[in-house]
């Protein structure tokens, strides 16, 4: 199989010095790479209203090496800068003409969600992110299996309801593991994967 695409995703938090995107750098396999997309959000409420959370994405297709350990280095510029990355995600899409046909839809964005009327003034309905998928039409009659995989940085234990095409398919979905403050071996990124074949549409999946 040949590599079709390789993308590096770097989520971060605690950026109250506006370090991202221009005062941070990312190297992949020793080569400085520019970010392609930058998504960010801020609560604007409470004690941490000015602490920006975000996601930076990098196209590393030409630098990715199969069969070896690939390395990524994320650094801030300036000793007074405050920015804390979570675990990186490296998504690699392969193509193989001898394999069965696959359709892969990738939607990248970033939102801070918190449902708490007392502390944030937000309801469950307001603290909802919508993720529409666009692309080629799906031949639903011939689909063997469809999986939905979600990545949620700092998704706490028992947190999050998951819907697909209007159907609730999970409750308390995301948990990144033991809570940690400061330097940690925990990637602090919750990953969930589940089958959605029964709810799949030919177009307009969300």
Each model region followed by its residue ranges:
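Solvent-exposed N-terminal domain segments of exported/luminal and surface proteins
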Residues: 1-25
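Residues within well-ordered beta-strands of beta-sheet-rich folds
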Residues: 2-11, 55-63, 74, 87-93, ...
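Short, flexible beta-strand-to-coil junctions
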Residues: 11-15, 76-79, 151-157
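Short linear motifs in intrinsically disordered
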Residues: 17, 60-64, 153
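Short alpha-helical "patches" and their helix-cap loops
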Residues: 20-30, 103-109
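Cysteine-clustered segments with highest specificity for TGF-beta superfamily mature ligands
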Residues: 24-82, 86, 164-206
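Helix-biased "structured C-terminal domain" signature
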Residues: 86-206
């Amino acid at each position: 199989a040949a590599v079709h695409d390789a993308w590096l995703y770097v989520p971060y938090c605690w950026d109250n010095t506006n370090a991202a995107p221009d005062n941070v750098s990312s190297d992949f396999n020793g080569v400085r790479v520019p970010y392609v997309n930058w998504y960010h959000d801020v609560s604007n409420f409470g004690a941490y209203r000015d602490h920006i959370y975000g996601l930076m994405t990098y196209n590393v297709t030409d630098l990715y090496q199969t069969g070896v350990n690939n390395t990524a280095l994320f650094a801030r510029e300036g000793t007074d800068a405050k920015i804390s990355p979570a675990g990186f995600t490296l998504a690699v899409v392969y193509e193989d003409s001898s394999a069965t046909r696959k359709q892969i839809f990738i939607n990248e964005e970033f939102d801070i969600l918190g449902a708490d009327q007392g502390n944030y003034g937000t309801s469950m309905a307001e603290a909802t992110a919508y993720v529409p998928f666009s692309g080629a039409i799906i031949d639903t009659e011939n689909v063997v299996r469809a999986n939905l995989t979600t990545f949620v940085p700092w998704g706490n234990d028992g947190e999050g309801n998951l819907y697909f095409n209007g159907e609730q398919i999970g409750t308390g979905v995301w948990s990144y593991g033991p809570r940690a403050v400061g330097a940690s071996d925990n990637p602090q990124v919750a990953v969930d994967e589940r089958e959605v074949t029964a709810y799949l549409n030919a177009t307009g999946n969300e």
